[in-house]
Amino acid sequence: MIKIHSITGRIIIGKTIGFAIGIVAMLFLPLFNIPIMGMFGLGTLLMFVLMGTLTGFMGIFDRHPMIDFKMPWWFRGPLVGATFLLMYVLFTYEMMELIMQSSLVTWMGLKSPFWAILDGICIGGLMGFVETKLAGEGKDLPLS
């Protein structure tokens, strides 16, 4: 039996949030004439699930192991989210450029795909917050 207050609980919560956000992102792809089940759609889903997994694992580190400074959830989650979305934008720049040029996005005045990193910061922060509130944090968390 898996206890929710554990490392495994954090990972399950992160994967669930990542899966939900990935599915929602995939459902918006037809608005930009991008197939849902294409490489971009499935890569988007996989990226958010892996982001949830890593934010779950990062909950073990409430202090940096080498520099010894405090790393609360509001630092860890957005850092992981920004890193994942930066990698995502760098790998899918052309497709993200098409999305940013659509009429659904241009009215906001955002032209660069790198604005998506702000989404990663918000999503990573949400993942870190929910995982910490429901499953705890720190090196004393049980494995399962």
Features from the language model and the residues they span:
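Juxtamembrane/disordered regions of integral membrane proteins
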Residues: M1-S144
